[in-house]
Amino acid sequence: EASQSPQYSFESLPQKICLICGDEASGCHYGVLTCGSCKVFFKRAMEGQHNYLCAGRNDCIVDKIRRKNCPACRLRKCCQAGMVLGGRKFKKFNKVRVMRTLDAVALPQPVGIPNESQALSQRITFSPSQDLQLIPPLINLLMSIEPDMVYAGHDNSKPDTSSSLLTSLNQLGERQLLSVVKWSKSLPGFRNLHIDDQITLIQYSWMSLMVFGLGWRSYKHVSGQMLYFAPDLILNEQRMKESSFYSLCLTMWQIPQEFVKLQVSQEEFLCMKVLLLLNTIPLEGLRSQNQFEEMRSSYIRELIKAIGLRQKGVVPSSQRFYQLTKLLDNLHDLVKQLHLYCLNTFIQSRALSVEFPEMMSEVIAAQLPKILAGMVK
């Protein structure tokens, strides 16, 4: 559920109302009209190294009386309102830039989802016909468009520091985000969606896709024994312990271990990856909601076909489908933790000496507060 606190806009309020808590404003502080209390709170939070966590659901009411109850929600609301220390402001997610990025890759016209898939029943069923050993055409296409691994640019000749590791991970995240945008352009059915929907889906799913990709690389290249962020950034347990995000590493480590346990095939992984892209949408839905539902149903059927390549029989196939979709569901809590950590690090990036590339900064500033406020489903 979205935050219960009133959503203010600068244009709609009297000039003396704090946009954070509704108290009387003392002026425009850090780019936003606020009271003295919220001004001081924001400055201390940004310059300190606090790791605020909400004890509730990240939807606490922030008003004059209760503004001190939950610093995590208060800080999130400051960020959501646009407060920036030292004039650090970011535009809304640059739709023009994304569209140019989408157009930058020379690819053939979008490949439609096969007619055979479109003609299948919307019900999820496991039939004997799925015993065919041939890889379905759409899954073959997913294999052909899978992006190459990208490098983090991390200098392994120097000792790890918290700021250097996080900066390298952010650089890697920027490159992977660009890779996701390019990959989505060649994904059958995706360009049939409204351009606003395409951008929204990428914004809401990028963290899930990156973590899922991390799990796959760790599974395939180091048998789930380490975290394989990139060929030049592989963390063994010792490096994880020495990092400032060891608990998050342990949580992320569970994904490749699940891949090992389930022995996930490449065909299954590719279908699950697309379903992650299509997993989170705004509460109000999408502009091309019907096309989105059709696309999602088609890729659910492709996952069933991928399962059928190795698993024979209705009952084992159904059990396998449950295990794989449960794995996707279990990503939700992990990704929420990563969103919180990412937003906190972003807000305090100057104090922590952590660099955030521009495109990644725009996504974080524009969408993470909405996701954490429960404005998606």
Swiss-Prot record:
GO terms for cellular component: nucleus. Residues 138-377 are annotated as: AF2. Palmitoylated by ZDHHC7 and ZDHHC21. Palmitoylation is required for plasma membrane targeting and for rapid intracellular signaling via ERK and AKT kinases and cAMP generation. Residues 16-90 bind DNA. CDD domains: NR_DBD_GR_PR (cd07172). InterPro entries: NHR-like_dom_sf (IPR035500), Nucl_hrmn_rcpt_lig-bd (IPR000536), Nuclear_hormone_rcpt_NR3 (IPR050200), Nuclear_hrmn_rcpt (IPR001723), Znf_hrmn_rcpt (IPR001628), Znf_NHR/GATA (IPR013088). Keywords: DNA-binding, Lipid-binding, Lipoprotein, Metal-binding, Nucleus, Palmitate, Phosphoprotein, Receptor, Steroid-binding, Transcription, Transcription regulation, Zinc, Zinc-finger. The modification Phosphoserine is found at S127. Residues 130-364 form the NR LBD domain. It is found in: Nucleus. A zinc finger (NR C4-type) spans 18-38, 54-78. One of its GO terms (molecular function) is DNA-binding transcription factor activity. Belongs to the nuclear hormone receptor family. NR3 subfamily. Composed of three domains: a modulating N-terminal domain, a DNA-binding domain and a C-terminal ligand-binding domain. Interacts with CUEDC2, SMARD1 and with UNC45A. Interacts with PRMT2. Interacts with NCOA2 and NCOA1. Interacts with KLF9. Interacts with GTF2B. The steroid hormones and their receptors are involved in the regulation of eukaryotic gene expression and affect cellular proliferation and differentiation in target tissues. Transcriptional activator of several progesteron-dependent promoters in a variety of cell types. Involved in activation of SRC-dependent MAPK signaling on hormone stimulation. This is Progesterone receptor. It comes from Ovis aries (Sheep). The lineage of its organism: Eukaryota, Metazoa, Chordata, Craniata, Vertebrata.
